[in-house]
Amino acid sequence: MGAMAEIQFIRGINEEVVPDVRLTRARDGSSGQAMFYFDNPKIVQEGNLEVTGMYMVDEEGEIVTRDVNAKFINGQPVAIEATYTMRSPQEWDRFIRFMDRYAASHGLGFQKSENS
């Protein structure tokens, strides 16, 4: 069994819905952003909106973003959007290592857009 990587909105509780992930990166590689979109995630289905952050957990430790927002339609939560901002090449590399593990353990077709 390979290394597991999980996304959690509450520490210790894995989110089962695999998100859409979009990546942007500065041309000079100094910074980047990852936008996560979870369509009807488990935490929303369970009516738990006490979300204070998104935790990306793997063998190296934990990456945390507090930029997490629920999306509502007709007053009902339907999705969660989270943004993780990377402010250095090291943070970018660390995030990519997490995403590679997450993609491998969750069957996510994760594509890095390479600028050639």
Swiss-Prot record:
One of its GO terms (cellular component) is plasma membrane-derived thylakoid membrane. GO terms for biological process: photosynthesis. Its main location: membrane. It is found in: Cellular thylakoid membrane. It holds the Pfam family Psb28. Keywords: Membrane, Photosynthesis, Photosystem II, Thylakoid. It comes from the Bacteria. Part of a photosystem II (PSII) assembly intermediate complex PSII-I; crystallized from a strain deleted of psbJ, it forms monomeric PSII before addition of the oxygen evolving complex. PSII-I includes 3 assembly factors not found in mature PSII (Psb27, Psb28 and Psb34). This protein binds to the cytoplasmic face of D1 and D2 (psbA and psbD), contacting CP47 (psbB) directly above the quinone b-binding site. Belongs to the Psb28 family. A photosystem II (PSII) assembly factor that binds PSII during biogenesis, protecting the complex until water splitting is activated. This is Photosystem II assembly factor Psb28 protein. The gene is psb28.
